Design a protein with these regions (language model features):
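Conserved acetyl-CoA-binding loop-helix of GNAT-fold acetyltransferases
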Residues: 81-94, 112, 116, 213-227
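A short beta-loop-alpha structural element at the N-terminal edge
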Residues: 1-16, 145-158
Length: 235
């Protein structure tokens, strides 16, 4: 799972993989659909972080993600059934803390695969994101290894974390009481926190030193964006 080529070559190969995989698994699509979706797939391959699986010098599978959402997962039809897709999903769950994915309802193999990986249906739409009549299932991981919890008790119990981001306790006291506070738990341990005031400003965000550089800050921001999406236009 490494990059051996320049980005343009990687994108071209991933688009090829997408088309080969779709032709093998999406029998509900017509030829015009593949032509329609190809530019969108190329755009996603260009802009999203990609995890690549190589066999020798050849890319045979890839996963694209955006924050904590798995946006793409495609495996060369010749390499299906070898556990490559499972490996990519497990990496995404563990290393980028992925928790959501959208899948075509008519792609029964994919629906069953994600169910085995621990995802469950959160909602359904009759059309896809382009308005085409292909129902989409939006899935969420049932038991992710980490979770965000809103603090309803003593917020100062997490002062050691708050002071990592804002070393002046008097300053923390100015905003803490009237703000929302959340803690990030991993395996039963609090490893991070975030404080958001009544105007939607993030006043404090911290992750324990031993968990820094592991995308937990991104996870917190992704959670906050979802939590406040109907209340604030931006944070």
């Amino acid at each position: 799972m490494k990059e051996k080529r320049n980005r343009a070559e990687i994108v071209e190969r991933c688009v090829e993989l997408w088309e080969a995989s779709v032709r093998a698994t999406h029998d509900f699509l017509v030829e015009g659909d593949i032509e329609f979706y190809r530019p969108f797939v190329r755009e996603n391959c260009e802009k999203l972080p990609l995890l690549l699986h190589y066999e020798g010098d050849e890319i045979v599978a890839f996963l694209g993600y955006d924050m904590t959402s798995i946006e793409m997962l495609f495996v060369d039809p010749d390499y299906r059934g070898k556990g490559i897709g499972r490996d990519l999903i497990e990496w995404a769950i563990e290393d980028v803390h992925a928790e959501t994915v959208a899948v075509n309802e008519q792609n029964g193999q994919a629906v069953s695969f994600y169910a085995r990986m621990g995802f469950e249906v959160e909602r359904r739409t009759e059309t896809d994101g382009c308005g085409k009549p292909y129902p989409i299932l939006y899935l969420r991981l049932k038991n992710p290894p980490q979770r965000m919890v809103k603090v309803t008790g003593d917020k100062k119990a997490y002062l050691h974390l708050l002071l990592d981001a804002d070393p002046c306790e008097a300053m923390v006291d100015r905003y803490l009481e009237e703000s929302d506070m959340f803690v990030l738990e991993r395996d039963g341990k609090v490893i991070g926190e975030a404080v958001v005031d009544e105007k939607g400003e993030i006043k404090n965000l911290a992750v324990l030193p031993e968990y820094q550089g592991k995308l937990y800050g991104m996870y917190i921001l992704s959670f906050l964006a979802g939590y406040y999406k109907d209340r604030f236009s931006c944070l």
